[in-house]
From Swiss-Prot:
Database matches in CDD domains: 5TM_YidC_Alb3, EcYidC-like_peri
Protein name: Membrane protein insertase YidC
GO molecular function, one term: membrane insertase activity
Gene, per the UniProt record: yidC
Primary residence: membrane
Annotated keywords: Cell inner membrane, Cell membrane, Chaperone, Membrane, Protein transport, Transmembrane, Transmembrane helix, Transport
Summary of the function given for this chain in its UniProt record: Required for the insertion and/or proper folding and/or complex formation of integral membrane proteins into the membrane. Involved in integration of membrane proteins that insert both dependently and independently of the Sec translocase complex, as well as at least some lipoproteins. Aids folding of multispanning membrane proteins.
PANTHER family: CYTOCHROME C OXIDASE ASSEMBLY PROTEIN COX18, MITOCHONDRIAL, OXA1
Protein family membership: Belongs to the OXA1/ALB3/YidC family. Type 1 subfamily.
Topological type in the membrane: Multi-pass membrane protein
Subunit structure: Interacts with the Sec translocase complex via SecD. Specifically interacts with transmembrane segments of nascent integral membrane proteins during membrane integration.
Compartments reported by the entry: Cell inner membrane
One GO BP annotation of this record: protein insertion into membrane
One GO location term (cellular component): plasma membrane
Amino acid sequence: MDIRRIVLYMALALIGLSLWNAWQIDYPAKQPVEEKTASQLTSDGHLLPQIIPSNAEQPVTLKAEEKASSGKQLIQVKTDVLDVDIDLKNGDIVKGLLLDYPLSVEDKNKPFPLLQNQASQRYVANSSLFVLDGQTPQSLDFDFTSEKEYYELKPDQNQLIVTLNGKSEDGLDVKKEFVFTKGSYLIEVNYKIANTGNSLWKGYFNTQLLRSSPKEDKSSIFHIGSYTGASFSNPGKNRYQKVSFSDMSKSNLDVDAKGGWIAMQQHYFLSAWVPNADSENKFYTLATDKDYTIGAVSQPITVKPKEDKIVGSKLYIGPEITSVLKGISPSLDLTVDYGILWFLSSLLFSLMKAIYTVVGNWGWSIVLVTVLIKLAFYRLSATSYKSMASMRKLQPKLQALRERYGDDKAKISQATMELYKQEKVNPLGGCLPILIQIPVFIALYWVLLESVELRQAPFIFWINDLASADPYHVLPLIMGATMLIQQKLNPAPADPMQAKVMMFLPILFTGLFWNFPSGLVLYWIVNNTLSILQQWYITRKYSDEKPAKKVVATAK
């Protein structure tokens, strides 16, 4: 029995089962979305949290066709990394293009549209002020104006400020300010409120992210999905908490938080509202008419007559880059979902990034990190291979015991243990070194799957995107061949059924890896190749048929 191979494949099966179960938790069967009443929306389509009794009378919602026919006036803002459209109706960001991230390898000239406001796909970032008219939430309609329709951050500018001007019927003079910074995906959004009336103004600041009919990236046996949904952080209580779309359909989130953040996630990219660290907000979610929203509403804001006040938040629209997110808000970097071994994955990614700065290619970085990991575990692996070599030496004696005792399993087991003791062989000696390495393999697996740096990153020859499957499926075939070679280095199992299963495994894993990202398959190829070389060396070194022994035998 080849303990290393059996334990390794059992570990792989266990990993696969664990990943499948984890993704089933993240992506449960879709529940029918409950048709929520219009009491959750204002007349301009903004969703508002239930901060008042749910049976209170609410304004009527505009139908989709009425909103479409009302027309929108947009302004465009372009920086070196962002291209956004702002709707002057409420100052919402309704389009967000990421200029440094092409839509695909084939469409290099088309930037990735993270935010968009299309009939088939609506994903926008809202921010607004609202008041309570009795018990009715009423979003204030400022009908903002702008000096220009197009703003652009010039190469010699470090910052661009876009100001929208508006005024409410009750004498509230508002300037909505967007601050864009060179090279940054973070936008400061501020309301400068001036109460020009004669009475105290009391209202709320509301920020939200809304997606309609989102497509969830679900996992299957031949595809690795990534989390698509909402999340939030409540400092001191929940560092990072996912809220799936199915969770929103079942119940509304209602969390009081100081600081923290709310976000909408998808593979590689993220949008997030980050309130001021000392501000107190209520985080909420709503699902209605196939629209899924996560939002944050402030505590009551009061502005005395002739008084000015500034309220605001920060909006991130961009890639999930760990180092960038870590500098924006605590725990925001956890949206780069490395799983339960995130701390180990972070260390491995730092190592990969350091190598990348030297070699300038993420593919070679994967290769070299795999080599370093194998070197780090060389002695443990050697112990495993030595144990296997010792077990192979005992195979004839073990077979003789089986023939002697036939079907008497108790005597076979007793005699086998006595043989192990006599020969000073630990049958489990090869297991522990492998088990110790498994967490590292899992951590690196998630690094390769979740790191946006590998998206559209070329390697060599035809591999032009390490985050996508090999277009010609050459890498999966090579990986299957390396698994087959590993099997050939081991004696066939005594059990015929086990031998058939082991022969089928390379075919099975080739099929499983057929559409896996090239970076993942590359890692397994390098890992398998190094394992083959080490196993061949150790097995040859500790084989009974050593050159020295052959010389002695000849002399006799």
